Amino acid sequence: MMLSFLQLNGSHHDVGVALGQFGAQALHHYAKTSPAWQHVMAFRDHSLVKHMQQQVQAQHPDYWAELQGLAQGLEMPLADVFTWNCRGDLWAWAPDGCTTIQKPGAPNRLAHNEDGDPLFAGYCAMVHIQTESDPGFTAFVYPGSLPGHTFGANAAGLCMTVNNLRTLHAQAGLPRMVVTRAMIGMPNLADALRYVQSVKPAGGFHVTLGQANQRHLVSVEFSHRQCSLIELNEASGHANHMIHAAMQHQPQIVTGSSGFRQIRLEQCLQAHADIEPLEILFDTKTAEFPVFRADPADPDQENTLASAHFEVGTDALQWQVHQGQCFEPVYWFKNDQLMTPDVKATNACNMATNP
């Protein structure tokens, strides 16, 4: 099923309501059938959740309004919806994964597999959001979740991809999904980097950032304890665990999939210097722990739900969204703008082969 495309305008509360209405049917079913939902809801009345709520209300009232609207549109209790949006802060085993390829050059290139709970397959969307306070942006969204913690780009030419980090011993702070929601709303790369270094998140993420007319891609790993930034000068990959030298001592879980994907990314980049990023993202050579993940019995309960490829040019971003191991995009974008709104995925797409 092709990803939906949503166009949302209005106040932050209005946007939240519309996102909730879009995801309501899927999330109601998910709440009844998902062990992950039940596990996260066990934290609903925890003091850590209450503190995180206070932090959002104090530091980001606009995003608190989005969460309130999201709960209204979902027709679910706000406490449940907020707790779900703190899932990765509260529980290291939340079903979020992802893989990113970073290739500095002319232009800089960035590609990403969005790995999430297969129960959400067919229920996600690309959404363009324009509020009164943020630059317009387009991002991949899950039912019941704030935008900004997946992949996307804004009107200022800032793009970002986000990978799960299974950090341990999270502490009170801003939910990591609120941190990345703020980052995709930043007017430029410098402001996004200043912001992520200044806040105190509860949990952790890896974020790769680039901006049109900026020389570098920047890799960011943050946890409650620390934030590390690296300007990338050579091709590299990230498979959702902390790999920065400054962060490797931090307590985390590295699953078999995460570890083997990291090894495979490095193998592909070393063996084929000119390899296309999507060729790596569509790789399945390691059968038990493939880079492209489509097994309903995936050991981390994650499947690749979409892929994105960004070219960070001198004056704009050009990027595409893909589904399946298909090189033919389903959507094309320039910065935050959809370029071909009637695009249909071809049935005769060029499928991936292992390098």
Stretch-by-stretch model annotation:
Residues H128-E132, L158-T161, V179-A182, Q226-L229, ...:
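Short, low-complexity, polar/charged sequence segments that are solvent-exposed and flexible
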Residues P107, R176-T180, L189, L193:
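Hydrophobic, well-ordered secondary-structure segments
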Residues G116-P118, R166-L168, R225-C227, G324-F327:
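Short, surface-exposed beta-strand-loop junctions and turns on beta-sheet-rich folds
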Residues F5-Q7, A26, W37-M41, A58-R176, ...:
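A contiguous strand-loop segment
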Residues E221, I230:
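Extended polysaccharide-engagement surfaces of secreted carbohydrate-active enzymes
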Residues A111-D115, V220, Q320:
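Catalytic Cys-His active-site segments of thiol-dependent hydrolases/isopeptidases
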Residues M1-D96, M186-L217, H224-R225, E234-P355:
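C-terminus-biased signal that marks the final domain/tail of proteins
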Residues Q53, L168-A170, R176-I184:
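Flexible, glycine/proline-enriched loop segments at strand-loop-helix junctions
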